[in-house]
Curated annotation (Swiss-Prot):
Functional description taken from the UniProt entry: Functions both as a chitinase and as a N-acetyl-D-glucosamine binding lectin. Inhibits the growth of several phytopathogenic chitin-containing fungi. Also possesses insecticidal activity and superantigenic properties.
Signal peptide: 1-23
InterPro entries, A to Z: Chitin-bd_1 (IPR001002), Chitin-binding_1_CS (IPR018371), Endochitinase-like_sf (IPR036861), Glyco_hydro_19 (IPR016283), Glyco_hydro_19_cat (IPR000726), Lysozyme-like_dom_sf (IPR023346)
Upper taxonomic lineage: Eukaryota, Viridiplantae, Streptophyta, Embryophyta, Tracheophyta
Database matches in SMART domains: ChtBD1
GO biological process, one term: polysaccharide catabolic process
Species of origin: Urtica dioica
Major enzyme class: hydrolase
Gene3D superfamilies to which the protein is assigned, alphabetical: 1.10.530.10, Endochitinase, domain 2, Endochitinase-like
Catalysed conversion reaction: Random endo-hydrolysis of N-acetyl-beta-D-glucosaminide (1->4)-beta-linkages in chitin and chitodextrins
Glycan attachment sites: N123
Pfam families named in the record: Chitin_bind_1, Glyco_hydro_19
PTM entry text: Proteolytically processed to yield a very small protein (8.5 kDa, 86 AA) containing only the two chitin-binding domains.
Domain (Chitin-binding type-1) ranges: 24-64, 69-111
Protein name (database record): Lectin/endochitinase 1
Length: 372
């Protein structure tokens, strides 16, 4: 579903080259309002992301509190980096061009930015997604069978929005059409993974989010990596919207969202917020220094002349299960087109290319090899 349809990185105006500024008021001088994710509130009551807003004249959400391990980015909740330090595309805080310039920088950048960052209309990413992209009535229409199929309403709209708050870049980058396409692509992938492959029903693309656990009966415990010692008696089988699989993926996902999923892998099938977070973690995270699905959808790595094609995506998602067949591709594209139609947005360019050349169905049984 990750498609070559999105616009090139927007060239920011000279006024924004040293930091993004919004007309949004905040703090004690701005009526008590708060700034969007990754922005700071100055003592004068305005939101921005440069030194005057986040440094010595900052009132709240300031440049401070860099993690002791110096990690940053969506995989760890987008924590701040210290003053004069930036978050690189590989998820580390640091200074200099390797962290702060152009396509190498993820946020807190010193010169250019990798893509348009949008000041949210409310106080949270969830508020933005809910108000601008997917409303609750529309979500219920998209997944009209989720309450009467095996998942029994487990995947709620509220859980989706709460989980999205931990990944503020999801569905908030670019214009409204771009944001809608990213959400449509994400929802299409998790729908394909959880549909139970209902090809025998009248409208199979209305049956997303129907399963929590894998529908394949197996005794495999998926304890495949010595880097993440498995808990006694636990299985790391496919669970949740993205069908998270293998102990190393449970370990890394849990580390990113602050849950011990090695000791408690069942949380992915019992807590819907955690379940959605694991899917968003996979979507937003870079694996083995490859671009994330989010980046590929946004064509964020175009500056490095890396066309998001089968080769790039294939480096992120392995083909171990061999589900790259026409029927699954057709089902995936069907979900995507249905959601785009419901969101009132075009499909984008080169749709046939993407589904003929991208093993998108591997999202159905996640097997990505990531560094522990």
């Amino acid at each position: 579903m990750m498609m070559r349809f999105l616009s090139a990185v927007v060239i920011m105006s000279s006024a924004m080259a040293v930091g993004l500024v919004s007309a949004q008021r905040c703090g004690s001088q701005g009526g008590g309002g708060t700034c969007p994710a990754l922005w700071c509130c100055s003592i004068w009551g305005w939101c921005g992301d440069s030194e005057p807003y986040c440094g010595r004249t900052c009132e709240n959400k300031c440049w401070s509190g860099e993690r002791s391990d110096h990690r940053c980015g969506a995989a760890v909740g987008n924590p701040p980096c210290g003053q004069d330090r930036c978050c690189s595309v590989h998820g580390w805080c640091g200074g200099g061009n390797d962290y702060c310039s152009g396509s190498k920088c993820q946020y807190r950048c010193s010169s250019s930015v990798r893509g348009p960052r949008v000041a949210l209309s409310g106080n949270s990413t969830a508020n933005s997604i809910g108000n601008v992209v997917v409303t609750e009535p529309l979500f219920d229409q998209m997944f009209s069978h989720r309450k009467d199929c095996p998942s029994q309403g487990f995947y709620s709209y509220h859980s989706f929005l709460v989980a999205a708050e931990s990944f503020p870049a999801f569905g908030t980058i670019g214009d409204v059409a771009t944001r809608k396409r990213e959400v449509a692509a994400f929802l299409a992938h998790i729908s394909q993974a959880t549909s139970g492959e209902r090809s025998d029903v009248e409208n199979p693309h209305a049956w997303g989010l129907c399963h929590i656990n894998t529908t394949t009966v197996t005794e495999n415990d998926f304890c495949t990596s010595s880097d993440w010692p498995c808990a006694a008696g636990k299985k790391y089988s496919p669970r949740g919207p993205i069908q998270l699989t293998h102990n190393f993926n449970y370990g890394l996902a849990g580390q990113a969202i602050g849950e011990d999923l090695i000791q408690n892998p069942d949380l992915v099938e019992k807590d819907p917020i955690i379940s959605f977070k694991t899917a968003l973690w996979f979507w937003m995270s870079q694996h083995d220094n490859k671009p994330s699905c989010h980046d590929i959808v946004l064509n964020a790595n175009s500056a490095a002349n890396r066309i998001p094609n089968k080769g790039v995506i294939g480096n992120i998602i392995s083909r171990a299960f061999g589900h790259d067949d026409f029927a699954v591709r057709s089902s995936s594209i069907g979900f995507y087109k249905r959601y785009c139609d419901m969101l009132g947005v075009s499909y984008g360019h080169d749709l046939k290319y993407w589904f003929d050349n991208t093993p998108s169905s591997e999202f159905q049984r996640i097997q990505m090899r990531v560094a522990a």
